[in-house]
Structure formats: C-alpha cells, structure tokens
Curated annotation (Swiss-Prot):
Protein's GO biological process: fungal-type cell wall biogenesis; protein O-linked glycosylation; protein O-linked mannosylation; regulation of endoplasmic reticulum unfolded protein response
Glycosylated residues (UniProt): 124, 324, 398
Organism: Saccharomyces cerevisiae (strain ATCC 204508 / S288c)
Bilayer-spanning residue ranges: 51-71, 149-169, 175-195, 236-256, 283-303, 603-623, 640-660, 666-686, 704-724
Cytoplasmic side: 1-50, 170-174, 257-282, 624-639, 687-703
UniProt protein name: Dolichyl-phosphate-mannose--protein mannosyltransferase 3
Molecular function terms from GO: dolichyl-phosphate-mannose-protein mannosyltransferase activity
Amino acid sequence: MPYRVATGYSEKSTDDDLIWRTPIVKEELEDADNFLKDDAELYDKVKNESAVSHLDTIVMPIIFTVLGMFTRMYKIGRNNHVVWDEAHFGKFGSYYLRHEFYHDVHPPLGKMLVGLSGYLAGYNGSWDFPSGEVYPDYIDYVKMRLFQAMFSSLCVPLAYFTGRAIGFSRLSVWLFTILVIFENSYATLGKFILLDSMLLFFTVSSYFCLAKFHTMRKSPFSARWWLWLCLTGLNLGCAISVKMVGLFIISVVGIYTISELWNLLSDRSVSWKVYVNHWLARIFGLIIIPVCVFLLCFKIHFDLLSNSGPGDSTMPSLFQASLNGTKVGKGPRDVALGSSIISIKNQALGGALLHSHVQPFPEGSEQQQVTVYGYSDANNEWFFQRIRGVEPWTDAENKTIEFVKGGEMYRLMHRLTGKNLHTHEVPAPISKSEYEVSAYGDVDLGDYKDNWIIEIVEQVGEEDPTLLHPLSTSFRIKNSILGCYLAQSGKHLPEWGFRQGEVVCLKHASKRDKRTWWNIETHENERLPQGEDFVYPKTSFFRNFMQLNSAMMATNNALVPNPEKFDGIASSAWQWPTLNVGVRLCEWSEKSIKYFLLGSPASVWPSSIAVCALIIHVIFLTLKWQRQCVILSDPVERDVFVMAAFYPLLAWLLHYMPFVVMSRVVYAHHYLPTLYFALMILSYYFDMITKRWATRNTGKFLRLGAYIVYGSIVIAGFFYFSPFSFGMDGPVDDYAYLAWLPTWQIVEDIRNT
C-alpha cells in the first residue's frame, strides 16, 4: 500500500525522501501523524528519520560551511602581490575611501563592498593597487581578501538549503553541496579582491529565495510567502547592482513568475480579485524592490564620491561642476570670439567631448579626423573664429571683446592643429546615411562649409539669454550651407579612430534630439573676469543615473577583441564547459606564488554532459507532450524536475548563451555563475537515476556506493588540483603533471607561441 506523508511522499518516493519535500502545514502533519500510528513500524521509521533530519539541519550545514571556508581561505595571504583584477577593484575601493569620482563598466555595489572591506581593515584609500606590486605594510590585504572570501564561503550553506528546498534527497543535497565546496574555480577566485564571488553569492541566494518562495505557493499572502517574495527581489537587486550579469538571474525569475501567473489564470478556485493581488504582490516584490535596490546603490555611489576624480568627464558638465576640486565651471561666464579656449560636450546619454587629432580618415575625404572623446585631453580644445569671407580675429585686437551670441554664424577652430570644423557631402565612416565631419584647412584656407550657426535651445539661470555661457547654455551647431546639425552618432570608430565616438552632421534632426545638443564644459580666457562666485544649479539624480548607466554600457560595448593584439587571457565561451583553457592570474616566474583559474575536471566535465543530457531530455518530453502522452504524472517528481532541472537549465542557458553571441571580449571567470546551475543539474540526475535503484534493498547500497564513490572523486580531484587554488611555488616544471590538456598553460604559454 503506498503511503504519503504530508505533501512529500508518493509511490515513487523512498524512505529517504519523507522529510525532504515541500513544506508540511501543521494540519497535514497532525493528520499524517495520526494515520501513521496505525502502522507502528512505519511510524517508528518516520519518527527516527525526523530526529536525524533535525540533527542534519543544524550540524551538516555547519560542517559544510566550515569546509567551504577552508577551501576559500586556506593560505589566502600567501601571495602578497596584487593579483589579477585586484588591480582594478582594489583601486575602485580606494576611490570610495578617498571620495573621488571614477568610471567603470560595472554597477557600484560590489566595489562599494570592496571599499567597505578596506575601511574595516583600517585602510585609508591612499594606494592605487598597481598590478603585480607588493602590498605595502599599511594595507591589511589579508582582511580585505577574507571579506571577499566570506561571500564565496556563504554560497556553500545556500547550496545546501537550496538542494533541500527544490526537493533533492539527502544524499543529493550533500553531493550538490560537496560539488560547490570542492570546485577549484570557486576556491581560486574566492581568495581575491574581486567581484565574482559577490556576484555568485547574490545569484545563488536569488535562486535559493525563489526556491523557498516556490515551496510557499500553497500558502499565498502568508507572512512567510511575503518574506521569501521580498527576499527574492532584494537579492535580485543586489545581483544586478554588482554586475549587469545579474540581469540573467532576473530573467529566470521573470520567466518563472510569468509561468506561475499563467497557471493561476487557469485555476478556477482563484477569484479575479485574488489573481490581481498576485500580480500586484509580484510587481512589488520582483520589480519595485530590485529597482529600488539598484537606484539606492547609485544614490549611495553619488553621495560617497563627492570629490573630482578620473571619471568626471563621463558625466554631464553640471554634475562635474558640483564636485569638490573640479576645474569645470571655474572660468569666465561669457565666451568671447578668438580669445576663449573652450571644450564642447555632447548632451546625449553617453555624450563625450568634441575632439580632433592629426590622424586622417583612411577613406572618404581623408581629412583630419573629428571624433568625440570621453576624457580630458588637449585635443578637446577649440575656439570661435569669424566666418569665412570676413577678416579673422587676431591677437592684435586685444582691446576688443566680441562675445559669442546665439543665432550668429561662426567658425570653430581646433586649437592645436589650427584646422576648421568642417562638413561636406561625403558619407560618414560608420553612419553612411549622414555627412562626414572633419577638420580641414586653416584660418585662411577653406570654404563656406566651415561656417556654423549657433542655435541656443535652453538657458539655465538668469544670465543674458542671447550669449553662450559655460555649462548652463545648451545649443545646437548647424552648418550654414548644408543645413545639417553637428551630432554624436552613438557609434564607435574602428581601431584607426582609436575606438572614439563618431561625429556626424545629421541631415534630419529633431530639435529635441539630444545627440545634437552641446554645451561648453571648460572655458579659459585671461582677458575676462573669472566666474568663481557663480552658483550652478543642481542636476537631478535620475538624469545622473541615466547618464552614468549609458556611459557604462558604451564603455562595455567598446570592450571588443582587437585582432591586431594578442590577449593571453581572453577565451571563447565554448572553451569554458569543456575546460579547454585556464587563466594565469599572476606573474609566472619561479619566485612568485602562481594561481591558475580552472574548473575541477571531476565536476565541470560531468556537469557539462548532464546539461547536454537534460537538453535532449527536455526535447524528448516536449515531443511526448505534443503527442498527448502523459509525462511527469507524479506531482512530487514533476515539482522536483521543474525546480531542480528545468529552471536550472533555463538559468544555465540564460547565463551562458549571451557570452556565445556577444561581440565583447570574454573570459573564463564569466562561467562561474553558469557552472553553479550545471552542478545543480548534475545533482538532479544523480538523484533521479539512483533513486530508482533504491526500490530494492541491494539497490539502496548500490545508490549509497555511487554517491560515496563520486563524492570521493570530486574531493580527491580538488586536492589533486589544489595547487591551482592554494598557490604554486617554485619552478613551473614541478607542476607539469597537472597539465592534462595541451591547452592548459601550466608550463608554457602555447597560445602566445
């Protein structure tokens, strides 16, 4: 006779599964308890199992967490040099401690936590973490690394409780946790001051909270239901606030939510009022909370970075003027013809400074390039000159101050090269439908296409509305002959243009098109009084937020492989699940402590096979379903498949496939969140296959033996490759035995030969 304990036992379940399934409400437990008392033998078995379970719930997570801390923290300070991307993220943490504004492609939460680790370690932010340099005595880098290692270590108990929440048997929960503990790539990167462990932690915690929320679906709107819903949203917000890769786990939760709402729509027991409440609750928990977390991180970011720093130029000019120690906005308030040296900034999202350099366009007019450039540079400096056909302004007119006015026509001349800003009916290098903009001629040589009309579109403040004022005047620049408008296209030039932004002359431009809006950012003129007492208006947080995120995306999109340069650590996505390559994380000399980023073969290769098997499995189930065959008829088995196989596969695909198709340069560490879901799928197959053996007494021992053997292989494999994670000292030839594949660059860098 088949028995069912609460919601977690069926004909296909084993005794080991009794207490590992979905939550048991009090009434169900009491009914099951009374029912089982009629069968004394089964009653004793369940009671004994329950006692073991309570012990297991407390003791095993602690043991596993301690093991995880060991693998991440053992010999964590052995290498006292700046290792790999510690050079980036340690420096960013220093900026927070110095309160200097900087620019990076990633959202701020992870780097703020790096800064917090430095603060807790007593570091004052005075060092910039030069790559490969020895840490100075006044930086307690071990404490900073331990702070990061805690995030990686805490993934272990999260994996344990996730396995329980999604319905794994005890053996599979243990196996899944062991796979996470003894994964060399996690142990290696978990030692250093990086963002990867933080991203992994919030990704893992997001799926854990989703799994717990899933177990509460029979008790909607209860306190625990709300708790796990809000915690899911909180962790999603943190994940995307560390790296934009957090969008992938948000997509997983979004698809899960849509599926659940679709199922509720077909449930006749759910009234329309309740259904609408389900929508509103999820909008609050899974949209509003993550968005608020994301916005809050940027608000704290702006508040902390109140001083001028290396990233100022990526932000609007008015924002830069609000920073302490800035040079922006310190010049005279009115711009004069000839004598005023200015820089001009575009106001589109990701807008940069008008720029020119001596290199010509390789095609088209072959005249001097005009671009936009995001950083301060002498090649950003221009000045206004009288139009072609009129006597040019010269220094001899030192007693005459002629201010630049809106509605008037001028030439713009590049200060360093003396050439005119020019356009003509030549296609732009990237945006072929628009006109090319170049620098051409000189003060005497040129044509009437050098003449531009200044159109003022917005004035902030109460100054003379007819004049150009630095920062507070927004204007457009229209060619007097062709009628097109100077604009930043938003596209980047190839390597011959140093990957700077393309400048075009737009033929058809709306007045509200911010790509055609410009403002003067810096202004120098010794003949005019300085406007030091002028108070600039505050910029809005949301405009600053949008501008910074646009600049982040533009910088990220510019990180494309350069075919003319060799990148020894870049790789292709197909090489990650196959372990085709690893990454040298530091100097590779005899005297240095060397680390090699590579996944554990004992877990990565089987997990990749499991993912491929599951893809075939899902296709097979889909074909059966289309033929109206019954699939996954057991509700418990179906629930485990959904949360332990289907959604992990979806998460694997969403985390992996973007790196297959994206054009930017990618590295092996991008696979770490993806690997977590592959390990979950591998554990699911162990659970599903071996559970069928347990229907016979001999099968139970066979099942236990399979777990013990494979778990031992995983642990032994970790320690075999532990030099990768704990550090390799001495000659690299001593570790040649670890190079199982010729592409593993343990002894020699074969990709650079």
